[in-house]
From Swiss-Prot:
Biological process according to GO: translation
Protein's name according to its UniProt entry: Large ribosomal subunit protein bL36
Keyword tags: Ribonucleoprotein, Ribosomal protein
Name of the coding gene: rpmJ
Molecular function as annotated in GO: structural constituent of ribosome
Keyword Nucleotidyltransferase: no
Source species: Photorhabdus laumondii subsp. laumondii (strain DSM 15139 / CIP 105565 / TT01)
Amino acid sequence: MQVLSSLKTAKTRHPDCKIVSRRGRLYVICKSNPRFKAVQGKKKRR
């Protein structure tokens, strides 16, 4: 999984890529081609 500062190009790499928000981070998931997985954002420290 790649950590990127911008997901603009990551979401257009494959037609099946989707952006999902989980736990304060943005994820790009691609079930048909998992090598396109990416994440944006850091975990907030408490």
